[in-house]
Design a protein with these regions (language model features):
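Ala/Thr-enriched low-complexity intrinsically disordered regions
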Residues: 9, 14, 23-24
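Structural/interface elements that position substrates and couple domains in central-metabolism enzymes
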Residues: 21, 25-138
Length: 138
């Protein structure tokens, strides 16, 4: 169990009937004084990080340094987000350094969960990202 994790959310992609798992210690979630971490900056994570980053302090985390470098230059090679929207997200920062997520209080994991021919999800990316996060939150 992650003891100092205030909020934790997982978005499981590529699973039929998208699953959303959310655990919270409070009934209402006021994000004004929170720092949000979006883990995984693909087609789900980046647009989410940009929208949160327009209003709330948000850290976009990805394991790919190339991905972070392009986003820091205001470019998105996947074309999920327009350069103008990236500029509007003035409370959004990017990093590949796991230590940077220590200061976050809300964690949203948006990593791939591809399905096999039997429509079973491969949860390996989710498991690995969760393990990585747990190391810095101890």
């Amino acid at each position: 169990m992650i003891s100092n994790c205030g909020y934790l959310a997982f978005f499981l992609r590529a699973i039929p009937h998208s699953f959303f798992i959310f655990a919270t210690r409070r009934k209402q979630l006021n994000l004004t004084d929170k720092k949000i971490a979006i883990i995984g900056l693909g087609y789900v994570g980046l647009p989410l990080a940009v929208e949160f980053g327009k209003k709330y302090t948000t850290l976009g985390f990805d394991i790919s340094q190339n991905r972070i470098d392009e986003l820091l230059k205001g470019k998105d090679s996947t074309l999920e987000v327009e350069p103008a929207d990236l500029k509007l997200a003035d409370k959004l920062s990017f990093s590949t350094n796991l230590e940077d997520i220590k200061k976050c209080t809300v964690y949203i994991i948006t990593v791939p969960t591809p399905i096999d021919k039997n429509k079973r999800p491969d949860l390996t990316p989710l498991e690995k990202s969760s393990e990585s996060i747990s190391k810095v939150l101890k």
